[in-house]
């Protein structure tokens, strides 16, 4: 993984809604928690500006992060993020400890490549419809991908790519597919324009 992310954090001794509100309003910090593994959960706070800046990078959401908690480094992933419903404020952040020998369940983004070369669009006049923009993967920390590529070059009109069609890095599996074949969800499709379908139906009616 090419990107590296590190955040500074401080331990929180005082907790509760009032204390969290003061952290955000007065100190410009985001309350959070580190949990998981055999170590007890730790209540922390991180800089709102630093976290907001990091969140602008898509890779931050699917990357192993380093939290420097008053001089002690913790390897974590961002597990949950609570935002204000209408203000650009991060309310709370949950970080899950990472252990190199334990598999992670992480959502990673899909990158659709070569859409401009898609045969179903260039030759068939179709349009691309995305059903999924991210997928949940299961893997060891060392195998965690920042994203999964979906090559659209050879996708034809009325063709649908499912989860089982995705090319995964070694050591990575899709959480949905572990639940059975009925969870092989559609990811992306190339459809004919509605007008073209109507014209075809009309032509078939005249031929009869």
From Swiss-Prot:
GO CC annotations, alphabetized: cytosolic large ribosomal subunit
Annotated spans, Disordered: 1-21
Gene Ontology MF terms in the entry: 5S rRNA binding; structural constituent of ribosome
Entry-linked InterPro entries: Rbsml_bL25/Gln-tRNA_synth_N, Ribosomal_bL25/Gln-tRNA_synth, Ribosomal_bL25_b-dom, Ribosomal_bL25_C, Ribosomal_bL25_long, Ribosomal_bL25_short, Ribosomal_L25_dom, Ribosomal_uL5_bac-type
Keyword terms of this UniProt record: Ribonucleoprotein, Ribosomal protein, RNA-binding, rRNA-binding
GO biological process: translation
Quaternary assembly: Part of the 50S ribosomal subunit; part of the 5S rRNA/L5/L18/L25 subcomplex. Contacts the 5S rRNA. Binds to the 5S rRNA independently of L5 and L18.
Alphabetical list of NCBIfam families matching this protein: bL25_bact_ctc, PRK05618.1-2, PRK05618.1-5, PRK05943.1
Physiological role: This is one of the proteins that binds to the 5S RNA in the ribosome where it forms part of the central protuberance.
HAMAP family: Ribosomal_bL25, Ribosomal_bL25_CTC
Family: Belongs to the bacterial ribosomal protein bL25 family. CTC subfamily.
Protein name: Large ribosomal subunit protein bL25
Organism: Hahella chejuensis (strain KCTC 2396)
